[in-house]
Amino acid sequence: MDILEYIEQHSTPESEALRQIVHTTHIEMINPRMMSGHIPGRVLSMFSQMIRPQRILELGTFTAYSTLCLAEGLADDGTLVTLEHNDELEDMILRNLALSPLGEKVQLVIGDAMEWLSAQSSDWLYDLVFIDADKREYSAYLDAVLPLVRPGGWILADNTLWDGHIIEEAYDKDKQTLALRAFNDKVAQDERLDKVILPLRDGLTIIRKKI
């Protein structure tokens, strides 16, 4: 038994819906590792349950595993809006959302995240935002979502350690690595934000908007 197996055995198990999503994702997708997975999913669920958000925004749906994890903490009349750029995933996402009653609280938007964000009004504020889309756009996503997050609201950003590449010189010319470094620096230097990076899988940054 390795440490990950130990952690999984001592954590809340996945729901049947999530197990089905894991199964179909591994069968149908070329890169199933893009899915959050059991322990990161439990962290998303636990975080959402702690704050009981009325409104959640997710950038990057993939196969909706993380979507349903986040939805576990929604207020009874809460809503989760999830954005996915790849229209080829739409049917699979809708099938997966239908596996759980929580899927009824989810609004799927297919299209470019930046275009959608730029059209939103700050009259509709989110309690929690999860960023897990194009790594090269993380800094732009942050600028776009900050006005849409309520004061005291939360932003979670996935993959911010990028499998450790973030500090490796061998990746100094890799565009995704450079973009994530810039994002991490941007967050660290922004005094409007409280922040911490957790060494969970590829790195998870927790951000609280102060004002």
Question: What are these model-derived regions, one by one?
Answer:
Residues 1-128, 135-156, 160-211:
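A short alpha-helical cap/connector motif
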